[in-house]
Structure formats: C-alpha cells, structure tokens
C-alpha cells in the first residue's frame, strides 16, 4: 500500500480563510498556524451563548483556531443577515442590534472583532451615563418653581376679581302689595302648652297652637264673616287640617276679643234693655257646642 500517496491526499493546506473542505481522515498536525486572531468561532456567530465570547478562547495559544462553518463545503445557514455583524451583547445596551461590516473578511461573514469595535464605541454617547448625553431620551423637565407659578398669577387674579365683583344693584323699591284690614290685626305669639301626665288633668285644658298659615286664613274669614254656618265651618276645618270644634272656639274667642277692643275705644253702642249680651248668631253657636264633635271626613262623606 502506498502510504506516501495517501498522506499527500490528506495534507491539504487549511486556514481560516481558505475555501477548502475537511476530509474524514484529516490530522490536526497538518494545519498551519492561522494568521487571524484566535477567537471563539461559535461566540462570533451569535447563535451559542448570545454572542458572548469567552476570555479563555480569546487568548492566543499554540493551537490553530477552529475553522468557521463557512469554510466548510456544506452550506450552513447564518443567524445574522448578510452584510451585518452578529448581535453583540453588552450590559449597557438593549436588544440585539446588527452593525454593518467595514469590509468582508471571510466567505461567510467571519470577521475580526476589531472591525466593528470602533463603530460600537461611537454609540456610547447616546446610551451611557443614564441618558445624560445626546441620546434619544429627552432631558427631564425641572420641577415647578416660582418662575412657573408666576406665569399663572394673572389668570388667577382675573378669576378672583370676577368672584369679588359687587353684586347687582337692588331693584328700585316696588310698591308693596295691598294690605287688607284683616292683615293689620295684632296677634300675640302662641304660648307653648305644657302636656300633663296621663291621668292628671283633662285634655280640654290643652291649648291649640295654630300655625301662621292657619291664623292668616282664619283672620281672613273672620273679616268677611264673623259668624259661620255649620257647612262653612266644616269646610274651613278640612282646608286648614283642623277639626270643627277648634274652628268654632277660635271664632268665639275672636268675637270676644273684637268686642273688648271696641269697648276700650268707646265705640260700642249701649245695649238696649231686654237684649241678651250675645247676638242671635252667638246663640246658635252656643247651641251647637254641646253637639258631639264632627270630623271633616264624616261630614264631607
């Protein structure tokens, strides 16, 4: 067997940049030293370990560097697009970015790290120092101070001046409503009745406190009619939410008060002999005092 012929077949010169193919019986001792810097070929591809190169593989050694997959005869897909460097990872950068190569140094995009180191160094101004440089982030606005609040002072002063405007002048004195005679009657303020304990005293001793509305309506009715009929008395009691007895007693007291005032003023004519003190109308009221108390609902029904 011709061993020299077989050795000449196996000894093909292989280097990092030479387009050659490996053989199944290739010996590592036949490779010449590579002229390129020894780096980790898998880290440069960006497919293993996120593109991070190990310091142990970046040191020069006596062994030749491994050939990139692009130097093999078998087509191998690359993770980075053609003409761009693989993604480089750094603590001060965000997502993976591709940077164009200065020049093609290999058949499959295999390049020296120094070809894009200068390009990456120019981007440190926009991303370093927490956004202090001329980066894509706008500078922070200063907090509001006296300068900003002073610009709003005129607007606030105008609003305050509108609120403090003098109220509208009062309208000229309009003529008051017509005052009737029954509205000029002097009334004493109602006195609060003391409620007795149950079983002590009679309920008739309680005094009814009329409201202003009720007194006004009763005075108005007394001005026109000093004596009420039974039907009119029931109607007024239902309107003012009173009972018939309360309306009857109020009219009796009101007639007595009216006669007392007339006597004090000397306008009461002397009573003729043989005439009772009360008029015929009063007699009719006295006759109905003994009648049972009728409620408005029973009368109207």
Swiss-Prot record:
Keywords: Developmental protein, Disease variant, DNA-binding, Homeobox, Nucleus, Transcription, Transcription regulation. GO terms for biological process: anatomical structure formation involved in morphogenesis; anterior/posterior pattern specification; embryonic skeletal system morphogenesis; facial nerve structural organization; facial nucleus development; pattern specification process; positive regulation of transcription by RNA polymerase II; regulation of DNA-templated transcription. The keyword Nucleus applies. The keyword Nucleus applies. It is found in: Nucleus. GO terms for molecular function: DNA binding; DNA-binding transcription activator activity, RNA polymerase II-specific; DNA-binding transcription factor activity, RNA polymerase II-specific; protein domain specific binding; RNA polymerase II cis-regulatory region sequence-specific DNA binding; RNA polymerase II transcription regulatory region sequence-specific DNA binding; sequence-specific double-stranded DNA binding. Residues 26-38, 55-70, 284-301 have a biased composition (Polar residues). One of its GO terms (cellular component) is nucleus. InterPro entries: HD (IPR001356), HD_metazoa (IPR020479), Homeobox_CS (IPR017970), Homeodomain-like_sf (IPR009057), HXA1/B1/D1 (IPR046327). Disulfide bonds: none annotated. Residues 20-77, 127-149, 254-301 are annotated as: Disordered. Sequence-specific transcription factor which is part of a developmental regulatory system that provides cells with specific positional identities on the anterior-posterior axis. Acts on the anterior body structures. It is linked to Facial paresis, hereditary congenital, 3: A form of facial paresis, a disease characterized by isolated dysfunction of the facial nerve (CN VII). HCFP3 patients are affected by bilateral facial palsy, facial muscle weakness of muscles innervated by CN VII, hearing loss, and strabismus. Belongs to the Antp homeobox family. Labial subfamily. This is Homeobox protein Hox-B1.
